[in-house]
Amino acid sequence: SSNMQKNIIWAKNEDVLQINSKASLLMDYDSKTVIYENNSKARLPVASMVKIMTLLLTYEEIDKGNMSLETMIPTTENASKMGGSQVFIDPYVEYKAEDLIKSVIMMSANDASVALAEYISGSEKAFVQKMNDKAKELNMENTLYANCTGLPAPEQYSCANDCAILLKKLLKYEHYHSLSKVWMDKLVHPSGRETELVNTNKLVRYYKGCDSGKTGSTSEAGYCLTASAEKNDFRLIAVVIGAKTGQERFNYVTELFNYGFANYENKTIVDSKVPVVENYEILQAKCKVANIYAQEDYYGLSKKGKEIGYDISYEINKAKAPLKSGDIVG
């Protein structure tokens, strides 16, 4: 038994993780460093996790000023008949964009997804083209979309790595965040009818720090989840594709989060509030010296208890008068 003990103590930390799904990944949000992965580039069906792209494109339309959260979206017979996970929208009426977005985020609603796609691009098919163009732009090499819902389709796949990259993009939208962490809500239809919304991502209720994510499940994809959690200013993204049960996928993502938070932390390498160079001499200036700051904070992922090794280099090539506070000098 003494041998056994020794092996356990010397086991590499990563070996402690037993994630028996088709694919999995744990990524540091800030640096996109992959902490753990298994089969993370394999092309697999990901079911409703396809909707991360549908949501991203919807928020980008809002960003561009092509629509707003208040925009009234007309529904079609086609959208209302989608089946699968849905919020039972009525055809031939108008819903506020925000209500449809909320239905996609919380309930993974196929009908609401198609209504948004049809509004944005005129048809789901045209919207899918947009999805694939965006995937190319984001260098998602192992992703191909055939619809905006994730309903089974022969030519449709993604991978754990691409799903993580996509959720990172979506998390930049404050409005997404405000809804993705909500556990229960309701959708009030134009007729006054109400549909209960319960977040399909149970971890927003049962895992402290988990505030976002997208579930997916079909018989071919198995049970999937891409989720994000934050503790002490350290954010992780975890992906599980093809778990055997709904509970198993939540357990696996919980294990990934626990592992990441227990073993890693985010260290600030460059703090934008502290001068990189103090009293830098500026040529031909009335006020001869100035402090120079980094434009943004830079973080480094580090294993707990280890010093992080790095070099900081900068080039100051534009520090000549006239200069005002906030000017870029290098």
Could you tell me what each predicted segment is?
Residues 2-161, 165-174:
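Active-site-adjacent loops and short helices of periplasmic peptidoglycan-processing enzymes
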Residues 140-144, 152-157, 161-330:
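Domain-terminus/edge residues, biased toward the C-terminal soluble/receptor-binding domains
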